[in-house]
Amino acid sequence: MAKNEITIENVEGDVNFGKSPEENVASIINIIIGDIVSCAVKIDRIDRTFPSKISNKIDHNNLRQKRIIIQEYKSYSSQIEKAYIIADEQVINGKEIAMSMLNNMYFKALDKFDIDIFDIDMTKIKKHADEIVDDIIKQLRKFIYKSANINSLYKEQVEIGINVVVAHAFVECLILENPNASN
């Protein structure tokens, strides 16, 4: 009879041999994404301009490659506030909880680039802005796919929803720095 033996020497991430307990818990963000992607939108791929307030923030943080998610957000901007209202109806303080989680993801991303959240170094922010946003997207993606209420969405919807939610957090100054609040 064959003997199955596994030797694990160094583990640097999550290891689950079955369904993780956190996968049995629903996510507020999934409610928001589900509502965002369920609406009909007209996507304007020609207009690549941004309102001046958003353009100032993009320039202030030196955001380059990830500007595309802000462009995508423009098509869904009216729907996202409705989605947060629906989240608040289903979960007490749903919007605030989701916003707090996104802000905490930003702080985790800053830590990866050795940026002190209490003494923001704008030189480092400008150098790593796209990477910081990318890290937040990765954190959010991992979080979403580990939650119980993801099953009713298509992967493409989830990916668009992630970009829209992260872009909204950028516009609301939860991620990256507000040009009006810096020294």
Where are these regions (language model features)?
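Long, low-complexity intrinsically disordered regions enriched in small/polar
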Residues: 1-34
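Long, low-complexity, intrinsically disordered terminal regions
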Residues: 35, 39-183
